[in-house]
Amino acid sequence: MKEILDAIQSQDAQSADFAALPLPDSYRAITVHKDETEMFAGLETRDKDPRKSLHLDDVPLPELGPGEALVAVMASSVNYNSVWTSIFEPVSTFSFLERYGRLSELSKRHDLPYHIIGSDLAGVVLRTGAGVNSWKPGDEVVAHCLSVELESSDGHNDTMLDPEQRIWGFETNFGG
């Protein structure tokens, strides 16, 4: 991880330098656990304390899929998606991950016993998957929560109508 941080802080690192960096097998992330989804059962919303359900875990680095980028997250925020996820309201996000996991072999990797939260980020691209043309290793990026596949014509005029649009880090795993 130190090599990644050194490259990010360097004024001289080029895209090829970032692409050549060794990637760790795991990283630290804020998660909620599937076996704790009932921990707040019977409590009013105001009595649910996110500090009880949020964990700082070492998690395996996920396989990079087509159209995806691996980003070294330098900043993220707590927003309503993070709070909802942490108190399992209005429903547990694990139901979204299970449903998404049934769509394809690639999306199956999202259905895990933990959920890495975060629906926005600022960071530096380390790797890109097949089909990513606008970004390259070393690019500084920000990301927001909307993930749109645009495989259906329903979303071509209005991405909010895409039946496959999801909120990244809320309805998908591997958040920021």
Description of each model-found segment:
Residues 154-172, 176:
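Short, compositionally biased
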Residues 81, 148-159:
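Short, Lys/Arg- and Gly-enriched loop/turn segments at beta-strand edges
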Residues 31-33, 87, 125:
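Residue-level signal for short segments within beta-strands and strand-turn junctions
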Residues 60-77, 91-152, 173:
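Glycine-rich beta-strand-centered segment in the early N-terminal region that forms part
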Residues 36-42, 85-99:
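Internal, charge-rich low-complexity segments
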Residues 15-18, 108-113, 164-171:
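Short, P/G- and charge-enriched loop/turn segments at secondary-structure junctions
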Residues 4-23, 37-75, 114-116, 131:
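A short N-terminal beta-strand-loop micro-motif at the entrance of redox/enzyme domains
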Residues 23-30:
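Short structural boundary motif marking the start of a folded domain
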